[in-house]
Amino acid sequence: LLAEANMWPEDVREYFGDGDECHMAYHFPLMPRMYMAIAQEDRYPIVEIMQQTPDIPAGCQWAIFLRNHDELTLEMVTSRERDYMYSMYASDLRARINLGIRRRLAPLMDNDMDKIKLMNGMLLSMPGSPIIYYGDEIGMGDNVFIGDRNGVRTPMQWSPDRNAGFSRADPQRLYLQPIMDPMYGFEAVNVERQSRTSSSLLNWTRRMLAVRATSHAFGRGRRTFLKPGNRKVLAYLTEYESDTILCVFNLSRAAQAVELDLSAFRTRVPVEMAGRTPFPPIGEWPYLLTLPPYAFYWFRLAQDVSAPAWHQEDVTLQERPTLVLFDGWNSFFREQVMPWRIGMAERMREQLETDTLPRFLEIQRWYAAKGTSVRRA
């Protein structure tokens, strides 16, 4: 049983009862604050509303979403915040309706794939069950020239065929026509086309859903929001049983660096979940990450994974092996030096072969046998 109540989280809490009434309830106040955070490049709107969200009975869930079949409601924000959202996302008055914005996700993000993926990355990792509005997985657009809220309810764009593959009926008999503009039209944006492209938004969404399914921590875990000094970065931990997930999001249009206090997880190795790439282990110092514009990471803080092979605990520069020659290259050859320097030449060659060259080889990037000692070269 799903409750649709556009109210503050503490008021919606009553609909769950003791776990014997509604199983799920929409978290309406979170939706506009996710858009506000990316517009302001500040995590505060998201963190504030999540701190106001009460615990709910075990077995119940919040339903979280980026868009739905109605307007992006702005009832749960202040009048000042509402004016800001209108100026950022609905400068065209035709996009406004009631106390909200009748646009889809892709147009709201200016069809910027990095921003769309960032929003979906937050959606899929926030506490609760994510709900994806049909068409958002392929970046469908809308039609602000259609009255009421029907501009975001156009037919699903399955293929470039007639009626976007949605219906074989006469196009004139459709209740709503499919989108036909050059950027979002069904000939350019459709499931059939994106299914054949590995880098498409559709296939990216499928991969991220598959990654999410590998850990129960996403849906059932307890969230702890971190408070790094850089407010352009949103970071939180999700813990469930022995599984710990770290989610980090860059809300800015510029690259950002962030230092995270992860000392409670010292010696664990963060493994980036999409590519299964191990990062350097967590130490006693703040953990430094850099993120490209509108980028995010999901890390599993693993206890049973080794640090990457290239990682060195001692990052100080090693002293370069040095050998001072008394007679240029002739110093290595006893046949080419004065008789009274033959002993010096032999010692010089011995030092070259057993010390200088082995140490030089071991620090070269192209040397494949890392971790093994070279006795003589």
Residue ranges of predicted features:
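Active-site and adjacent substrate-binding regions of carbohydrate-active enzymes
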Residues: 1-312
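Conserved NTP-binding catalytic cores of kinases and kinase-like/nucleotidyltransferase enzymes
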Residues: 312-377
